[in-house]
Amino acid sequence: MARPRISISMICLLILIVGFVLQSSQARKVLVPYGTSKGLFLSALPKGNVPPSGPSDKGHTSPPDDTDQRMVPENSPEIYRRLESVPSPGVGH
């Protein structure tokens, strides 16, 4: 009678495939409780009234009115000089 030969490489391939299938099926069965993610998020939030971040009791203030005058207008040539591309230091000599 002729016996079929199974090579070692076929056995290794079969073990490898079975291992991947078992790992992937086990990974799908991991249960995450519904309230866990909400509890972590809510515990990171501050409780009660949040004090102002500045040293004064005024709280948050608006920026000064002259900020618009200090900004560079869009049609100014200065903006083109600032946005020019510069070659990297590795190029050239």
Curated annotation (Swiss-Prot):
Keyword Zinc-finger: no
Gene Ontology cellular component annotations, sorted alphabetically: apoplast
Residues with Hydroxyproline modification: P87, P89
Protein name: Precursor of CEP13
Molecular function GO terms recorded: hormone activity
Quaternary structure (record): Interacts with CEP receptors (e.g. CEPR1 and CEPR2).
Gene: CEP13
UniProt keyword terms in alphabetical order: Apoplast, Developmental protein, Hormone, Hydroxylation, Secreted, Signal
Induction remarks: Induced by gibberellic acid (GA) but repressed by nitrogen (N). Accumulates in roots in response to nitrate and ammonium chloride NH(4)Cl depletion and to osmotic stress (e.g. mannitol). Repressed in shoots by nitrogen starvation.
Post-translational modification: The mature small signaling peptide is generated by proteolytic processing of the longer precursor.
Positions annotated as propeptide: 28-78
N-terminal signal peptide: 1-27
Family statement drawn from the similarity comment of this UniProt entry: Belongs to the C-terminally encoded plant signaling peptide (CEP) family.
GO annotation terms (biological process): cellular response to nitrogen starvation; nitrate import; regulation of root development; response to ammonium ion; response to gibberellin; response to nitrate starvation; response to nitrogen compound; response to osmotic stress
Described purpose of this protein according to its UniProt entry: Extracellular signaling peptide that may regulate primary root growth rate and systemic nitrogen (N)-demand signaling.
Sequence segments annotated as region (Disordered): 45-93
